[in-house]
Structure formats: C-alpha cells, structure tokens
Amino acid sequence: MDAHRKHVRGIVDELMNNSIKAGATQVDVRVEMKEGEIIIWVKDNGRGMDAEKLAKIKKALDQPRRDELEEYYGALAGESMVGTGLSLVGMMTDRAEISSEPNKGTEIRLFRKTED
C-alpha cells in the first residue's frame, strides 16, 4: 500500500487544485485505502460544469493506466503522452465517476486497484 501513497497524494493535490480554480469555497476529500483498492472522493461547491465540459473532463479521466500503456508501448509512452493534469490523474487510476452541475459544484470518485 505504501507504494500507492505517492500517487494518491498527487491525485488529491490535482483535484483540490482544480476545485480551488473553479472558485470552490468548500472542498470535501475522502480517501479510503483498503486491500485491493483505493477510492478517492472529492466534492466541491465551485462553478461546476455544463454537459460539454463534463464530457471533456470525463474523457481526460478515462485514460488507460500508465503501467498498461508502458506494457503496450514500452518506454516511449512516458515521453509521447502529454496531457492535462487530469489526463495524468486518469493514467494513475482505473475508473472515474464524475458528476457536475453549473453553479452547484462537482463530485469526482476515482478508483485505483492496488493488487498486481
């Protein structure tokens, strides 16, 4: 589990940063680390997103895990994959759930398997 703590810290930092940029005055964060899986939940009261922007964010979070890319593309994956912070978050997680409503905020739940 210790090997995953660095990834969790980076993911939480990126999500909190985005919440603050979206004007949130309240950000709730919960991390549940259990055998086999880590669940990261962030909910804010920021500007929220319309359906079009929400779809773009979902696409960014739906990146394949980086270790899966490296297996497929070899060492080139790390150099050729350039994207937003959320794309990087997507590459560190297995599954994302996101909901948002304009002027009401955003809720993101991310799941990362810890068993190899």
Language model segments and positions:
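Conserved beta-strand-loop-beta-strand hairpin that lines the nucleotide-binding pocket
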Residues: 21, 25-116
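Conserved short strand/loop->alpha-helix "switch" segment adjacent to the catalytic nucleotide/phosphoryl-transfer site
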Residues: 1-16, 20, 74, 78-81
